[in-house]
């Protein structure tokens, strides 16, 4: 069994902020597995970054996908000296020393991240699994790499007020799991009363 460092062993007030190479090195050195988030730049390079937008972590405007990788190098993570890392560089650094949980950040129906990142992961020699809030990403893996352990992320979207509509009702209640057939579900632990979460337990 492994304990995992969420976005690396990080502290956003230090020189090892979330999803940084420094935070990942600290996790490896401490013997923790690593959970990280990947998405594509404008020039289709997988980078490790949680939010779709730059504002919270980098103080910048726009989204990751609005910038090329080189353009993103102008930004620093949480006022540290760390910059947004390439997924490929993280894989090379970890080098199978600890297991990875790779969250695929997929907006709407754009699945272009999946084949690009999957090519890198198939060449990777370490232990890993994938997960995503977007069931289309989980389904892509069911179809194209069914032997890989895949997870469906979910949350009480409607309770948090920021999200409304049929789509978030479907996601909150895991209504597409019968199609995507995830190997595990990771649900926001702050909402134990949600029926779909209870059923999964």
Predicted regions: what they are:
Residues 1-201:
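Phosphate-group recognition and catalysis centered on beta-loop-alpha active-site segments
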């Amino acid at each position: 069994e492994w304990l995992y460092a969420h976005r690396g062993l990080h502290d956003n007030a230090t020189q090892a902020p979330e999803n940084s190479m420094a935070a990942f090195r600290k996790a490896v050195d401490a013997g923790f597995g690593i959970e990280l988030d990947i998405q594509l730049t404008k020039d289709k390079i997988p980078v490790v970054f949680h939010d779709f937008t730059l504002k919270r972590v980098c103080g910048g405007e726009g989204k990751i996908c609005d910038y090329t990788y080189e353009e993103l190098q102008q930004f620093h993570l949480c006022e540290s000296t760390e910059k947004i890392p390439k997924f490929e560089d993280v894989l090379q650094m970890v080098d199978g020393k600890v297991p990875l949980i790779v969250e695929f950040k997929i907006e709407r129906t754009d699945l272009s991240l999946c084949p690009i990142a999957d090519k890198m992961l198939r060449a990777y020699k370490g232990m890993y699994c994938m997960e995503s809030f977007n069931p289309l990403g989980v389904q892509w893996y069911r179809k194209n790499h069914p032997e890989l352990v895949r997870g469906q992320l979910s949350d009480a979207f409607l309770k948090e007020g920021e999200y409304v509509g049929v789509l978030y009702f479907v996601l909150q209640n895991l209504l597409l799991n019968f199609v995507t057939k995830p190997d595990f579900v990771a649900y926001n632990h702050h909402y134990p009363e949600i029926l779909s979460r209870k059923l999964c337990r």
